[in-house]
Amino acid sequence: MKNQWNNILSIGEKVLNGEKITADEALTLSKSNGSDIFLLCSFANKLREKFNGNHVDLCSVINAKSGNCSEDCAFCAQSAHHKANVSCYPLLNEDKILEMAKQREAYGARHCDIATSGLGYTGDEKDFQTILKAFKKMKENTNLKLCACLGTLTEKAMNSLAAVGVERYNHNLETAKSFYKNIVSTHGYDERIKTINYAKNAKMEVCSGMIVGLGETMEQRIEHALLLRDLNVDAVPVNILNPVKGTKLENAKPLSPMEIIKTFAIIRFILPDKIIRYAGGREKNLRSLQPLGFLSGLNGMLIGNYLTTNGQSVNDDFNMLKDLELEY
């Protein structure tokens, strides 16, 4: 135990001094168990405080087009390859999207993300033009920071989003490259990375994260986090698998709450100065331990409902942040 304490403290001091940790050092941190996990989390919280202060970045998502997706992501209720009981509907019109954006601004979101099912867009589609109009109306009628989650895009499509005021693009890699083939077969990992690079070239912030609990190892979570560091993304949403009946992963074994908390902390050690965001699955998987996420290095949160599952009440989220004396 004492040796692991020393490992945590020495690696943590290295990060505090502005140095990057190695894959081997991250693996050393992952050996923390029992009370060592709380020291690991405490140091991750110290890193969050030093590099990011006490502000929590809040965002919300609009599921603007749901279901009937051509892709076969094993976790996703919206895939046409699955038999999940999920609401399916075509793209909402721009006025409906604006109405939903105003609702999210009213309940406290600072960023609003328009998300659509499907592989992505080239920039010429009628639906994509509707999305551009929706963003223009949001820019004119709200104070929200505009975000998009539209799948893989061409450079042309990405530049069109930037031109109407979209400031952040969300494109999750989902898992490590070494595990990806177990989760998706209909499009490749490099396609996703190309989209991230298009967003960076368009001078957008990039939000790219992961789902934990897909069957990956801790080593693969570390592999993924190190790649996100290399890609220099701005924000990392961490989803925890919430298995949906009818999907390939409906019977996946859930991670233990302490394994999840330890994962948050290690990601903070790897990405000390980034937004690391609570995303889907926290309510089901962590239950009463949700506040521990913010004591383990998190500094962002998706509030309200998710794409196909419900989140806890916004008031409960705000009360949690107030109790932790965090700003938002």
From Swiss-Prot:
It catalyses: (4R,5S)-dethiobiotin + (sulfur carrier)-SH + 2 reduced [2Fe-2S]-[ferredoxin] + 2 S-adenosyl-L-methionine = (sulfur carrier)-H + biotin + 2 5'-deoxyadenosine + 2 L-methionine + 2 oxidized [2Fe-2S]-[ferredoxin]. Gene3D superfamilies: Aldolase class I. SUPFAM superfamilies: Radical SAM enzymes (SSF102114). [2Fe-2S] cluster binds at residues 112, 147, 207, 277. GO terms for molecular function: 2 iron, 2 sulfur cluster binding; 4 iron, 4 sulfur cluster binding; biotin synthase activity; iron ion binding. Binds 1 [4Fe-4S] cluster. The cluster is coordinated with 3 cysteines and an exchangeable S-adenosyl-L-methionine. Keywords: 2Fe-2S, 4Fe-4S, Biotin biosynthesis, Iron, Iron-sulfur, Metal-binding, S-adenosyl-L-methionine, Transferase. PROSITE patterns: RADICAL_SAM. Residues 51-282 form the Radical SAM core domain. Its EC number is 2.8.1.6. Homodimer. Catalyzes the conversion of dethiobiotin (DTB) to biotin by the insertion of a sulfur atom into dethiobiotin via a radical-based mechanism. This is Biotin synthase. The gene is bioB.
